[in-house]
A protein has these predicted regions:
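Short beta-strand/loop motif that positions the catalytic acidic residue
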Residues: 239, 245-247, 251
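Conserved acidic catalytic loop of the alpha/beta-hydrolase fold
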Residues: 83-101
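Conserved alpha/beta-hydrolase "acid-adjacent" motif
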Residues: 252-258
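Conserved HGGG/HGGXW glycine-rich cap/lid loop of the alpha/beta-hydrolase fold
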Residues: 19-72
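N-terminal cap/lid segment of alpha/beta-hydrolase-fold proteins
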Residues: 1-25
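Alpha/beta-hydrolase
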Residues: 147-234
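Conserved hydrolase catalytic core segment
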Residues: 99-143
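Catalytic active-site module of serine/aspartate enzymes centered on a nucleophile-bearing elbow/loop
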Residues: 268-314
């Protein structure tokens, strides 16, 4: 049995429009900041169980942020994914963060790109772990569950509130049977995800995250899917910040080709393939993700001389094999 990671701080901020935004902090207080965006579904406790040890060892302050409609974040559907950057601007201002790296798991990936686009002089680098690709316009990728949801985007728009309440009710009903539900989900998952779920602390982390994330509302899941099927408000082609992708080559939810597709659109992107892993395999690479992002931090020893606002390079994708934590 493992132990879920314990936040150094667990709280909320108030935005200028009166909404609340939930967040948690892990790792080194006062260290270089990494903002972590959870998956879909997910909340602020969805993070590697080793986050404190890995972040402390590297002097990193990890801040996990809940999107509107989950945990302690007030329900709110932004018009576009890009509008999430306004919430992050206020959060970082209130927490005293100027420059930062960002990382996002699965559904958190598009929000990483949005912030990198919005703050090219503040975001030093970004990581996308099994991230969702655009579904609209010339940047769209084919296949995957989000592409399927795109076919139903009109009813999703109309039914988002009742669907959110339905998911919330289902989560509340299942929580007393969390252990049993987890084991059923584990057995029906691909081998790569089963290995992740069996790692020390993963089960406890996921159960805690769903429990605390669904206490008040659980609408963020539906809001995310609705936003994924809209125009994002920007193109990955215009993201000048270095972005690194981690993606399992057996991902059954977001195909590996999606990671390569989005990376191929960007001026400075690389893909780290995770052989034999599925959708959640990149959670096991959290230490590697930290090391790569810190290596791109311009003011750190041994970091490259280029800055996030450097002139655009010729678009390229380089594939490397992931090595775990």
């Amino acid at each position: 049995m493992g132990i879920e990671p314990v936040p150094r701080r667990d709280g909320t901020i108030t935005l200028v429009d009166g909404r609340r935004l939930g967040y948690a902090e892990y790792g080194a207080e006062g260290g270089d900041a990494l903002l972590w965006f959870h998956g879909t579904p997910g909340a602020r406790h969805q993070i590697s169980p080793d986050v404190n040890a890995l972040a402390d060892a590297r002097g990193v302050r990890v801040i996990t942020v809940e999107r509107p409609g989950v945990g302690d974040s007030t329900p709110h559907l932004h018009p576009r994914i890009l509008d999430w950057a306004g919430d992050i601007d206020q959060l970082t201002g209130q927490l005293g963060v100027d420059r930062f790296a960002i990382a996002g798991l699965s559904g958190g990936g598009p929000y990483v790109l949005a912030c990198a686009h919005a703050f090219p002089d503040r975001v030093v680098a970004g990581a996308v772990l099994g991230g969702v690709a655009p579904t609209q316009g010339e940047d769209a990728a084919d296949g995957g569950l989000v592409a399927l949801a795109n076919r139903f985007r009109v009813p999703l728009e109309w039914l988002r509130e009742p669907l959110g309440y339905t998911l919330w009710g289902a989560a509340k009903l299942l929580m007393p049977f969390g252990d049993q539900a987890f084991e059923i989900y584990l057995r029906t998952s691909p081998p790569g995800d089963q290995r992740v779920f069996r790692m020390p602390g993963m089960k406890e982390m996921f159960l805690k995250d769903i429990s605390t994330g669904s206490r008040k509302r659980f609408h963020a899941v539906i809001y995310d899917v609705v936003l994924f099927t809209r125009d994002w408000g920007f193109s990955p082609r215009d993201v000048r910040v270095p972005i690194r992708f981690w993606h399992g080559d057996e991902d059954h939810i977001v195909p590996l080709v999606h990671g390569h597709h989005v990376a191929s659109l960007m001026p400075d992107a690389e893909v780290y393939e995770r052989p034999g892993e599925s959708h959640l395999g990149s959670l096991a690479a959290f230490g590697e993700v930290l090391d790569v992002l810190l290596g791109l931090w311009p003011d750190r020893a041994g970091a490259p001389a280029e800055t996030a606002s450097a002139p655009a390079k010729k678009p390229r994708t380089r594939t490397r094999k992931g090595t775990g934590t």
